[in-house]
């Protein structure tokens, strides 16, 4: 709706994450639960649903471990698929060419916030 301001939820501070780093969390937005993760790269933050497009399973192999060893890509724990930080595009693995589902996050005055009105799905 034009003129409507989407609600925002602060999920952490930018300084809470190393560069690069990742963090998983469960968000409750409009009474729906979402398993998501965020990735910091420099002053940018990217958010995605924690769901591999190949299997639908979670991407992390341990809590908050979403990145490959040299922290250059998001890596799926199940089949080692690699995804770019900036757009979630899979560049290697069984789901090459597929995309992670983005979660709308931004940095505002040093806080990482998720924007409710732009959330990708109604829940799962």
Residue ranges and their predicted role:
Residues 1-69, 84-85, 99-124:
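N-terminal pre-ligand scaffold of iron-sulfur
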